[in-house]
Amino acid sequence: MKNLLLTFLVVTIVCLDLGYTLICNRVHGLQTCEPAHKFCFSKTVMPFPNHPLTLMGCTYSCPTERNAVCCSTDKCN
């Protein structure tokens, strides 16, 4: 009986994420954020005329630019 309970405990620990980490979209794939990063962001910049560049990922605080999107749930950007 003790072995069964121990097995369930191990499976629970392995299957559950003990510390919540935010997951944000990137241009190519997903990014698991560090614990200090609380927001996902997306913003478009124009480094050259007619060549927009989209930046996406995790951040400590929300960008203040008017073309930036900031959110705090998984894959929201």
Curated annotation (Swiss-Prot):
SUPFAM superfamilies reported for this sequence: Snake toxin-like
Cysteines paired by S-S bonds: C24-C40, C33-C58, C62-C70, C71-C76
Site annotation (Key residue for inhibition of muscle alpha-1-beta-1-delta-epsilon (CHRNA1-CHRNB1-CHRND-CHRNE) and important for inhibition of neuronal alpha-3-beta-2/CHRNA3-CHRNB2 nAChR) points to: M46
Q: Which InterPro entries match?
A: Snake_3FTx, Snake_toxin-like_sf, Toxin_cobra-type
Q: What is this protein called?
A: Short neurotoxin OH-32
User: What tissues has this protein been observed in?
Assistant: Expressed by the venom gland.
Residues marked Key residue for inhibition of muscle alpha-1-beta-1-delta-epsilon (CHRNA1-CHRNB1-CHRND-CHRNE) and important residue for inhibition of neuronal alpha-3-beta-2/CHRNA3-CHRNB2 nAChR (site): F48
What Pfam families does the entry give?
Answer: Toxin_cobra-type
What family name appears in the similarity comment? Answer: Belongs to the three-finger toxin family. Short-chain subfamily.
**Annotated function:** This three-finger toxin binds and inhibits the nicotinic acetylcholine receptor (nAChR).
User: Which positions carry the signal peptide feature in this UniProt record?
Assistant: 1-21
Feature type site, description Key residue for inhibition of muscle alpha-1-beta-1-delta-epsilon (CHRNA1-CHRNB1-CHRND-CHRNE) nAChR: T44
**What would be one Gene Ontology cellular-component term for the protein?**
extracellular region
For whether the record's keyword set contains Nucleus, the answer is no
One MF term in the entry's GO annotations: acetylcholine receptor inhibitor activity
Kindly list the places in or outside the cell where this protein is found, as annotated in its UniProt entry: Secreted
**Site residues by UniProt (Important residue for inhibition of muscle alpha-1-beta-1-delta-epsilon (CHRNA1-CHRNB1-CHRND-CHRNE) and neuronal alpha-3-beta-2/CHRNA3-CHRNB2 nAChR):** H28, K43, H51, R66
